[in-house]
Structure formats: C-alpha cells, structure tokens
Swiss-Prot record:
The gene is mtaD. Keywords: Hydrolase, Metal-binding, Zinc. Its EC number is 3.5.4.28, 3.5.4.31. SUPFAM superfamilies: Composite domain of metallo-dependent hydrolases (SSF51338), Metallo-dependent hydrolases (SSF51556). This is 5-methylthioadenosine/S-adenosylhomocysteine deaminase. The keyword Zinc applies. Binds 1 zinc ion per subunit. Its cofactor is Zn(2+). Catalyzes the deamination of 5-methylthioadenosine and S-adenosyl-L-homocysteine into 5-methylthioinosine and S-inosyl-L-homocysteine, respectively. Is also able to deaminate adenosine. Zn(2+) binds at H71, H73, H219, D307. It comes from Syntrophobacter fumaroxidans (strain DSM 10017 / MPOB). It comes from the Bacteria.
Amino acid sequence: MGSSRADLLLVNGMVLTLDPDGRRFDPGAVAILNGEIAAVGPAERLAADFRATRTLDVGGCVVLPGLINAHTHAAMTLFRGLADDLPLMEWLQQHIFPAEAKLTEDWVYWGTMLACAEMIRSGTTTFCDMYLFEHKVAEAARAAGMRAVVGEVLYDFPSPHYGPIENGLRFTESLIERWKEDPLIRIAVEPHAPYTCSPSLLTRCNDIALRHRVPLIIHLSENEAEVEQVLSRYGRRPVAHLEEIGLLGPHLVADHCVALDERDLELLGERGVHVVHNPESNMKLASGIAPVPKLLERGVNVALGTDGCASNNNLDLFGEMDTCAKLHKAATLDPTAMPAETVLRMATAGGARALGMGGRIGELSVGRLADLIVVDFRKPHLVPVYNPISHLVYAARSSDVRHAVIHGRLVMEDRRLLTMNVDEVMERVRYIARTIKP
C-alpha cells in the first residue's frame, strides 16, 4: 500500500491519455485527488504508490478523456421528434417557434436534466449551451454534476425570456457574476447569428466577452440562405462581416461554418477562430457539409457538437464521431480524410480549446481536471482490439460507456446515474410534452 493518497483509483484498463504524445498505458491506471488527476501510468506502479478511498477495477475497458459537446441547445430535448423532414423555415415557423413561445424556466430545467442524463450515459462530460432561461440550464447542469459553458441567446427582437435586448445584455452580465467562482459552470456571451443581430449588438456582445474574458459564441454561415441574407443586407459574407466589425479572434467560437468560400477559410485561420462542426444536424436540415478538412489544413481548431435534439435527434457524440469521419470521406472521395484519431481529438482536446479550457480538460495528464469515461470493450462488436481509437470512432456505441467521472466525482457507475433520479426526470418531461402537443 503506497503513501500517496487518492480519492479514486481506476486500475487495469487501457488508458488513452490523448496528450500531444499520444501516451497510452495497458494495463494502466489513473489516480484522482481533489477533482484533479494526481497520476497516470502503469497499473502496477500506481496500485503500489497510491492509497485510495475508492478503487475501481476497469479491466477489459478503455479509459479516456470525457467527450465534449461543443454546441447544443440542451432543453430542446423537449422537442425531440416534434417535427421532422421539413424545410428549415417551415420547421422553425410552424413548429419550433410556436412551441418555444410556451417555454417556462421550469420546462428548461427539466429539459436540460434530461439532456444531462442522455449526455452522461453517452460519454459526454462537458457541454456548451445556447438557449433561453440559461440560469436554469446552469442550475440543471450543476445538479447533474456536469461541466458546462452556457449563455443566453441574444438577438435584436424580443426574447420569450427577457423581452428587450437591453434586459438580455444585463442578464448575461448577471450570469457571469453569479457563476464566476463555480468549478463546473462557465458563462459565455452568445449572440445568435449575423442575420438576427445588428452590428451594434454584435459589438456590444464582443465588448462584454472581452471585458470578462469569456468566450463569444455565434452561429455562423450555417447555410447558403444565411450567406445570401447577410450579403444582401450588408454587402459582405457573414465571416467578412464579422471581420469588418472586429469580432474575429481566438475568443470567438463559430458554430456550423458550412457555407464558406476560400476567403472565409483564410480569415478563420488567420484570426484563430474556433469552429464547431455539427455534421448530423447539418445533414438532417440539409444545410450542407462544412469543409472541415480545409479548415484543419489552415490550422483552425475544430470541435464537435450535436446541435439540439430537435434537429439531430440525439446528443450522442459517439454517433457524431462516426458520422463525421465517414461523411468527409464520402464528400471528398478520399478514404484518408478525417482519420479516427483526428475526429476523437475534435471531440476531446478540440472542444476543450474552443471553450477556453485547453489547459484543464481534454486529456489525461497530471494536474488536469479529472473528467474521464470508461468504455467497456468486452463486447462482441469491440473484439478483437488492434486499434482502440479506431474502435471508439467506428465501432463503439454510446451504450458501451460504463463509468463517467466529472471533476473527480463518479457521476455514473455501471450505467447507473448517481446524480439524479432519471425516472423522475423522464416523467416530468412526458408531462411537459402533453402541454407542448396535447
């Protein structure tokens, strides 16, 4: 029995650190103390060195950083399957907007709790949210034990939550102040898109983000219709429009970025903008295919997201990784495009960098926050194992996630959620759904 103390010790699994050197230990171990990783290394050595309050034998499993869903609208679980297979404007105006007009903060809380249950069970430990009543999103994420970056959606027309935009800006700053010391919750400034926000509003949002040193997050160039709308209004494409008013920079997270030309690609790379790729939502809404290989060639950090449940219709990053890798091979007719390791790093370190936590999460290294998942490889569809990263992207399912640890806390053990009564959460959402669609 060693002299070093640990709160939790995971032993005998194959540990994929996903650090820059790609270190792995098999059999390996991870020691956790006070919410951080105290040691990573060979299982025999760590078992001898550490005296742990709790030890989990994860033999036959793979231990890796928790996945990061870098763009979603968590409470839209409430609208999963409400309307599908429709043109975008018809889908929004006839179905989603009328449903959102009924939203209450209580609905958002329970919709987010349902999202957290789904995400934890599918290996996601951090998510980034843009929606309404975001104080309830923060509260739900905190109750579920998830790490989250959240921000109230801001636009020039009245919000179902805060009304006039002045209230929205004040609300955003109050959120920043309320959550600034929290270990799990971080606030971002989140203007909706260039076609719903005036240059003046975008500038004010940028000023708030820079002043508080928090991310600025926006939907950008999601489809060709958006590009045409911004072009006709301002005489510039959306990316060039944001460049003109001073928004492009390493603090900006741009969601989607589907409809890009060569100059757009150059600007995003030159300014250090982070991009979040949402392949399944883009496919389902027929928005197109984001030129992710070209973005990566230009040095753009690309993260992975699911978007909301109304346009995906799940929050499963394992499925998203598989789709991402295969979609770009088909789109480019190049089987070497988007290799498995590139995609896995998008869903881990790429998301961490985009959300301003590149030095804290996204890899298993000493001193990093202890956000990790354990995937059970003792399954017929995961045998034999020549390349575990290949299996994680092309063969594993979200249901293979066995344990989840966030900030050093075991939030799921043997598929059982430890931070909520998931049956109660589902029943609450079923009740809400009867009001949404009687």
